Curated annotation (Swiss-Prot):
GO molecular function, one term: ATP hydrolysis activity
CDD domains to which the protein is assigned, alphabetical: ATP-synt_F1_beta_C, ATP-synt_F1_beta_N, F1-ATPase_beta_CD
Name used for this protein in its record: ATP synthase subunit beta
Source organism per UniProt: Pseudomonas aeruginosa (strain ATCC 15692 / DSM 22644 / CIP 104116 / JCM 14847 / LMG 12228 / 1C / PRS 101 / PAO1)
SUPFAM superfamilies: C-terminal domain of alpha and beta subunits of F1 ATP synthase (SSF47917), N-terminal domain of alpha and beta subunits of F1 ATP synthase (SSF50615), P-loop containing nucleoside triphosphate hydrolases (SSF52540)
Function of the molecule: Produces ATP from ADP in the presence of a proton gradient across the membrane. The catalytic sites are hosted primarily by the beta subunits.
Record Pfam families: ATP-synt_ab (PF00006), ATP-synt_ab_N (PF02874), ATP-synt_VA_C (PF22919)
Domain of life: Bacteria
Gene: atpD
Membrane topology term: Peripheral membrane protein
GO cellular component, one term: proton-transporting ATP synthase complex
Alphabetical list of SMART domains matching this protein: AAA
Length: 458
């Protein structure tokens, strides 16, 4: 435990000088005397000076202030005491409900499980959302990315997934809010409370208004809590909203740390930072972590370095499309762009596989015919193509679904559709069993029986 003093402050990056024989190690936590600010060592510059990132506001700090080393990395509460609580990046409670009362604290920087400890598995995780269960099914213990630009429904989709899985799957969840809107964090807390699943969720927030240090580390705080549950032999869900802001926080401090920016101004360590986080999100022989991550896509460009780096780590990608949202079809998942490693007849069965590929074929063909329809009109199509277009439009509408978490906005009650019903419904449309029904009947319904009932009222 040594003591040093601040010699330079540039934004969130602070240089501290220590005696040369007592320089703190990389990732060690430092405490500024007389101020509630924690720093994390990032670099050793030589001559006893270390460069650190502030985990909190740097207001009120000045050169010459004394800083104590703690001899350890930032540690956060883990275990059941964290459930139903909202914490910040350092594990301090921010929900005004008293101390956490944890029995154990873990450091946020941990080794990823070794190859020998990791476990593979092909068990499906049913979400109750038709389009996801059909074309990009999730694996238990897998990683899923929700990709989308601004305002196409990433957070709403994520809230629906948490609600469905918490109620139907009754496991523990950890939610890390990384650089998102504080309002959404608040809505999210109340949504969980109203659904009576709050006692199964630990919430960690480092929102948009927080300094970059908080946003850079809050995902690791949430992940550490999830790892504890996993190591106790549980199946945990880890939700990260939004992984792009984790990258962005790294970009903000990267230049201040003296690194040259790389492509599009991102930090040169982008792939490594992403890998450090993603490699820890994995299932071991003790338990599993299934992670669902929202990924903001800047300017709807999927080739941007940040989303492109994330793609490599995922088992399933759910792509939300502005074109589909503009048709009023929610969830606005693009069934042609979304993929899953599980979409394999050996994993999901031949019936499910054939139905999913059939749906994608019909929608792809409809996409190709749209140009002809726009120029020449429907009458110029062959009878077979006319039938295909009619079915495609029904499928497109049947891929929509009312959400439980959106009841307040839509006024229609949410629907949970089992995988069996989902496959049966789409199979029926592909086989022409519902050719006689109008396409409006398929819009915003749950199962296919509901569409048949709706058609009678039209």
């Amino acid at each position: 435990m040594s003591s040093g003093r601040i010699v330079q402050i540039i934004g969130a990056v602070i240089d501290v000088e220590f005696p040369r024989d007592a320089v703190p190690s990389i990732y060690e936590a430092l405490k500024v005397q007389g101020v509630e600010t924690t720093l994390e060592v990032q670099q050793q510059l030589g001559d006893g000076v270390v460069r650190s990132i502030a985990m909190g506001s740097t207001e009120g700090l000045k050169r010459g202030l004394n800083v104590d080393s703690t001899g350890a990395a930032i540690s956060v509460p883990v275990g059941k005491a964290t459930l139903g609580r909202i914490m910040d990046v350092l594990g301090n409670p921010i929900d005004e409900a008293g101390p956490i009362g944890e029995e154990e604290r873990w450091g946020i920087h941990r080794e990823a499980p070794s190859y020998a400890d990791q476990a593979g598995g092909n068990e499906l995780l049913e979400t109750g959302i038709k389009v996801i269960d059909l074309v990009c099914p999730f694996a238990k213990g897998g990683k899923v990315g929700l990709f989308g630009g601004a305002g196409v429904g990433k957070t709403v989709n994520m809230m629906e997934l948490i609600r469905n899985i918490a109620i139907e799957h009754s496991g523990y969840s950890v939610f890390a809010g990384v650089g998102e809107r504080t309002r959404e964090g608040n809505d999210f807390y109340h949504e969980m409370k109203d659904s009576n699943v709050l006692d199964k969720v630990a919430l960690v927030y480092g929102q948009m208004n927080e300094p970059p240090g908080n946003r850079l580390r809050v995902a690791l705080t949430g992940l550490t809590m999830a790892e504890k549950f996993r190591d106790e032999g549980r199946d945990v869900l880890l939700f990260i909203d939004n992984i792009y802001r984790y990258t962005l926080a790294g970009t903000e401090v990267s230049a201040l740390l003296g690194r040259m920016p790389s492509a599009v101004g991102y930090q040169p360590t982008l792939a490594e930072e992403m890998g450090v986080l993603q490699e820890r999100i994995t299932s071991t022989k003790k338990g599993s972590i299934t992670s669902i991550q929202a990924v903001y896509v800047p300017a709807d460009d999927l080739t941007d370095p940040s989303p492109a780096t994330t793609f490599a780590h995922l088992d399933a990608t759910v792509v939300l499309s502005r074109d589909i949202a503009s048709l009023g079809i929610y969830p606005a998942v693009d069934p042609l762009d979304s993929t899953s490693r599980q979409l394999d007849p050996l994993v999901i069965g031949q019936d499910h596989y054939d139905t999913a590929r059939g749906v994608q074929y019909v929608l792809q063909r409809y996409k190709e015919l749209k140009d002809i329809i726009a120029i020449l009109g429907m009458d110029e199509l062959s009878e077979a193509d006319k039938l295909l277009v009619a079915r495609a439009r029904k499928i497109q509408r049947f891929l929509s679904q009312p959400f439980f978490v959106a009841e307040v906005f839509t006024g229609s009650p949410g629907k949970y559709v089992s995988l069996k019903d989902t496959i049966a419904g789409f199979k029926g449309i592909l086989n022409g069993d519902y050719d006689h029904l109008p396409e409006q009947a398929f819009y915003m319904v749950g199962g296919i029986e509901e569409a048949v009932e709706k058609a009678k009222k039209l």
